[in-house]
C-alpha cells in the first residue's frame, strides 16, 4: 500500500511542478492562420517571442491570447509560451 501512495504523491507533484499541456489553452478553439512572414501561427503551448506570432482565439469576447512568460519545469526557468485563457478566470 505504501508504494502505491508514494507513486500517487510523486505523480501529483510532477503535474504541479511541470504543469499540464492543457494549462496553455490548447483545447480552446483557436484560428490557425498564416502570418505575413509566411509561417503558420504558433498554437497554445508553443514557444514564442512576440504575441503576434500566436494563434488568436475564435471567441475574442470571452478569451484572450498572447505570448506570456510561464514557468517550465522541464527547462527549470521561465520561458515565453503562447497561451489562450478565459477572461473571467483568475488565471488569465
From Swiss-Prot:
Glycan-linked positions: 62
Signal peptide: 1-19
Compartments reported by the entry: Secreted
Keyword Transmembrane helix part of the UniProt annotation: no
Tissue localization of expression: Expressed by the venom gland.
Disulphides: 41-55, 48-67, 54-82, 85-92
Molecular function per GO: ion channel regulator activity; toxin activity
Gene Ontology cellular component annotations, sorted alphabetically: extracellular region
Regions annotated as coiled coil: none
Keywords from the named record: Disulfide bond, Glycoprotein, Ion channel impairing toxin, Knottin, Neurotoxin, Secreted, Signal, Toxin
Membership in a protein family: Belongs to the neurotoxin 21 family.
Domains: entry comment: The presence of a 'disulfide through disulfide knot' structurally defines this protein as a knottin.
The protein's role, per its UniProt record: Probable neurotoxin with ion channel impairing activity.
The protein, known as: Toxin ICK-15
Species per Swiss-Prot/TrEMBL record: Trittame loki
Lineage: Eukaryota, Metazoa, Ecdysozoa, Arthropoda, Chelicerata
